[in-house]
Amino acid sequence: MNDLEKKFYELPELPYPYDALEPHISREQLTIHHQKHHQAYVDGANALLRKLDEARESDTDVDIKAALKELSFHVGGYVLHLFFWGNMGPADECGGEPSGKLAEYIEKDFGSFERFRKEFSQAAISAEGSGWAVLTYCQRTDRLFIMQVEKHNVNVIPHFRILLVLDVWEHAYYIDYRNVRPDYVEAFWNIVNWKEVEKRFEDIL
């Protein structure tokens, strides 16, 4: 036995009030997304961790394949939402274009910010079913990549560093935009917190 503590996931507070992203994301939409959906991933991940803990302590068998698949889904959802809340902010403080090293890399790898925005938006709009558009950085090639993640855990490239994410699950926008995902994606650009995204990038260079 050792005295190391086993920790579990917790729902974080948002870095802004629930009405801070209006009119682009309503208070109602953000509240439900955070308190219900993000909380569900916290609960799902913790339930799987406890199930695995109990099986190990009692030396009983579990369906490892099913448990690990479900765990990756819930943990992926938990982590991606952490990035999502952090890379948004009030429209009067956010939006526009990035600056500094991130702007230089976007121009290097995409040709222009306009081209990057177009490709990222296309990745978000065309994601099949539920998923995410994700801007990442590959240290091996010193390049920015766009990933189109299905659900929370499919098409994720290992070891790529996450910079910017956009949730395109219907629960992220249906109250405000119904089934018109392109309008939601367009509105997202008004609330991107580029200072936070730039900080994420600078921290890994």
From Swiss-Prot:
Signal peptide start-end: none
Record flagged with keyword Transcription: no
Co-factor binding comment: Binds 1 Fe cation per subunit.
UniProt binding sites for Fe cation: 33, 81, 167, 171
GO MF annotation terms: metal ion binding; superoxide dismutase activity
PANTHER family hit by this protein: SUPEROXIDE DISMUTASE 2, SUPEROXIDE DISMUTASE [MN], MITOCHONDRIAL
Protein name: Superoxide dismutase [Fe]
